[in-house]
Amino acid sequence: MAKIKLGIAPIAWTNDDMPDLGKENTFEQCVSEMALAGFTGCEVGGSYPKDPVVLKKALELRGISIASAWFSSFLLTQPYEQVEKDFIAHCEFLKAMGAEFCNVAEQGNSVQGKLDVPVFAGKPTNTEEQW
């Protein structure tokens, strides 16, 4: 029988897109409550330590490991070389954390995090060339 591990995203405690939501929840509270709830894996959140040694120590104390992390690519709005450099650095961080997965989404021209832009009326559309 396969062993299943259960993980959760820290967005249940803090919201990286809307930082006012959950800003009172510290990293330590977030991962402690994850562990108390029985989770053994999690995504990386914006409030997490950026140093793999520091992050690993805090997570190992609670029996949690990093399962993945979100990567926002901006291929539509930034030079490819910059996006590639950022992606490689992100993957190296994940590898140092023992993660095997990376969640990737194109965010160039996204309305995400732009609270003054209507989701439907203000959404951009890609040109044929961008597709």
Please report, for each region that a protein language model flagged, where it lies by residue:
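Active-site gating loops and adjacent loop-to-helix segments of metal-dependent hydrolytic enzymes
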Residues: G113-N126
